[in-house]
Amino acid sequence: MEWKVVDTVISPSTGVSFSCIHSLKNLRLTLWYQADVYMPPGSIIIPFNKGVLINDKLYPVTVYNVTRFNPVLWKSLKENSHCPGNCNPKSEACSYPFECLVSVCPFGLTRNIQIDNKKV
């Protein structure tokens, strides 16, 4: 089944991404996953056994949960993610003050801060 990505939120404290997806049959879900790829709004995705096809390219994705879309939960996810990449307009540098658990920044932001005496 083909899905359209409505919105995506990244959680730097957990490394988990959340995407609101919408089917042609008017079903809205929230996908909780970990991946090295960002699913931008407007992307067309098709689930497969070992990942997801995003705009006709296969990417590995670990899906943790799929739930019915809940607007109250979605608002809470957006307000509490604290990832500067989730904001508009986006800056060039990451201002997240703690260690980011996202392995590859999907927004291409650079980290120029010290955390626990380690450059991140």
Swiss-Prot record:
GO biological process: cellular response to starvation
GO-annotated cellular components: cytoplasm
Record flagged with keyword Cytoplasm: yes
InterPro entries reported in the protein's UniProt record: Anti-adapter_IraM, PmrD_sf
Localization, UniProt: Cytoplasm
Keywords: Cytoplasm, Stress response
Protein's job: Involved in the stabilization of the sigma stress factor RpoS.
Family: Belongs to the IraM/RssC family.
Protein's name according to its UniProt entry: Anti-adapter protein IraM
UniProt gene name: iraM
